[in-house]
Amino acid sequence: MSTANKLKVNVESDNFTETSHRSPVRALPSTWYNSPEMYELEKRAIFSKKWLLTTHQNRFPKAGDWMKFNTTGYEFVIARDRKGNLNAFHNVCRHRAFPVVQGGQQGNSSIFACKYHGWSYGLSGNLAKAPNYDQLENFDKSKNGLFKIHLKVDAYGFVWVNLDSSENPEPWTRYFEGIDQQERLEKVNWDDYTLNNEYSMEGEYNWKILADNFNECYHCPTTHPDLPTLADLGKTKCDTGEGWIKHSSIQTEEQKKSGMQLASTYFYPSASVVVLPHFMMIQRFMPLGPTSSSMHYQIFRNKNSSEEDFHNIADLYARVVSEDKDLCIGAQKNLNAGIFVSGELHPRLEHGPLSFQESHRQAIHEHAKLEREAGRQIWPARQKLPSDEAAEANKEDEALCSSLSCGGIQEVLAW
């Protein structure tokens, strides 16, 4: 028998009661992992209105530094302006919707100029120039800046965005209050961590399979032979809140001396941060479609760490996430086959994925209820038109198109 098969996994949690883990719990159905309709609903209910962790503020040391992101087809930019503030906006020109920021995923610019008709914008997203529009009446430059995105920098320096176009999205504190004040992280100097490299791995798997897999170590003894060098898999801990999952483990004295003290936090819906003395990883699961996703990794190195100390952990994690990719591809293949509906999860050893699934279930049902009451799809990230005559006419045109897609005037078009 292999060493891996001899290992036993034990997960403790402050969330359990004496009666809460006596029976297995049924997981989400497989249709939630491959349905195109569910994927579209998730774009509206989750990725258009939830706070999303993107990166760390130390990626923007100078004015003009910018990074480009894409979440379920929503491409947006985060940039530092000349006042030192970070701003986020959709990468959509207000004139004819052409992408304004091009040329890679990051860079430094003094201004953002659209290559279609020459409209240009400042680092805060305000419209700077619209050629020949100064000849027109009733054109307000102040109302034609890039579509702003809500942005928050937490106490640790992590940068969050919320794509909800309303003035008042759900508060960040609703799900994450205090998550940037963790006692186990109070001695971490976040300024010591600088980007070493980043990479992505695309695959044929739903993003939630990645989340389920990351948030339990029940599979670790079977599939990750390197992990016992990082922690004692027999003494792991998983604590959960409504929007977060905290993972920790016990290290031997030798592991502590090697800088293996691990603290991992998953942030619903699709990001996590793993930090150790020599290494930090920001992991983002980015949906590309109902059954395809990208695993994106930003790898930071402690500037005070040696090459050996950093690579001992960085190389281990690179192997682990590659192994996880293979697991998720295999599981997704069988979910798509239409035989498997759902399995029974261990309420203690798989407490993390169960917590994730419950958060997701609640968010989906909450938004679906709003849509049923409204009698239409609700896209929180969508542009809100002003209340003027031209905009009202535009709304009528849009309503016609909406009725076509919803089958509202099928009888008129039938022949």
Where are these regions (language model features)?
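C-terminal catalytic domain of Rieske-type non-heme iron oxygenases
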Residues: 3, 85, 91, 152-415
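Short, contiguous pre-domain boundary segments
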Residues: 9-31, 191
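Short, flexible segments with low predicted structural confidence
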Residues: 10-18, 123, 180-186, 256-257
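Non-catalytic accessory segments flanking enzyme active sites
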Residues: 32-71
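Generic structural signal for secondary-structure transition and capping sites
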Residues: 47-51, 98, 219
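Short Pro/Gly-enriched beta-strand edge/turn motifs at strand-loop
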Residues: 48-60, 130-135, 265-269
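Rieske [2Fe-2S] iron-sulfur-binding domain
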Residues: 59-165, 169-175
